[in-house]
């Protein structure tokens, strides 16, 4: 018996079957489709129970072409960091850094380019740099120049927070870990 709910396929029956199983892309799925000795696809078997909030599922291979297979995951907890990917205009080096959301929205973020070793201001919510003319982050700085920033959801990044900003962020449940404590040490 198959029950379909929000794209998630679950199966009842044949639990604990010893038939050969082809897992393919279903390494963490609760439901796997079994092939018999002749290579024909059989009914689904439940290989193991998936605990936690992450799961993957697909429809049986014969119902949907490979390009249109259904994948689903439950929503994960929101990340407390951004992944910044940028190209330095001085040396044209492309690099990526991990920065905390709290520092980006409430503090100062400065990253160092691995190519030319220059420091680049990514966010200044504390008003430390007067030449930014009131702009607070890289999105506003580049928007003033007519350029766009693509948001995609660390390394060699300096993140500075006010004590109030870090404390309110942890009260809101947005924990930044070492970046927050490093930022608080810099302000001491």
UniProtKB/Swiss-Prot annotation:
Organism domain of life: Eukaryota
One Pfam match: zf-DNL
GO biological process, one term: protein stabilization
Entry keywords, A to Z: Chaperone, Metal-binding, Mitochondrion, Transit peptide, Zinc, Zinc-finger
Region annotation Disordered: where it falls in the sequence: 169-188
Compartment list: Mitochondrion
A GO molecular-function descriptor: protein-folding chaperone binding
Disulfide bond residue pairs: none
Zinc finger intervals, DNL-type: 77-174
GO cellular component, one term: mitochondrion
Segment annotated as transit peptide: 1-68
Function: May function as a co-chaperone towards HSPA9/mortalin which, by itself, is prone to self-aggregation.
Protein name per the record: DNL-type zinc finger protein
Species for this entry: Xenopus laevis
Gene that produces this protein: dnlz
């Amino acid at each position: 018996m198959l029950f379909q709910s929000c794209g998630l396929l679950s199966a009842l029956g044949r639990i604990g079957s010893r038939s050969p199983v082809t897992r393919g892309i279903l390494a963490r799925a609760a439901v796997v489709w079994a092939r018999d000795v002749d290579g024909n696809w059989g009914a689904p078997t439940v290989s193991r129970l998936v605990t936690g909030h992450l799961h993957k599922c697909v429809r049986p291979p014969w119902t949907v072409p490979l390009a249109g297979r259904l994948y689903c995951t439950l929503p994960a907890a929101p990340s407390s960091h951004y992944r910044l990917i940028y190209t330095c205009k001085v040396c044209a080096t492309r690099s990526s850094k991990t920065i905390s959301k709290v520092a980006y929205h409430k503090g100062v973020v400065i990253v160092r380019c691995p190519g030319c070793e220059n420091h680049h201001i990514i966010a200044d919510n504390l008003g430390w740099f007067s030449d930014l003319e009131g702009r607070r982050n890289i999105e506003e700085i580049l928007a003033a120049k007519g350029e766009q920033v693509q948001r995609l959801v660390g390394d060699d990044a300096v993140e500075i927070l006010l004590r109030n900003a870090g404390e309110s962020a942890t009260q809101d449940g947005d924990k930044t870990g070492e970046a927050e404590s490093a930022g608080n040490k810099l302000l001491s």
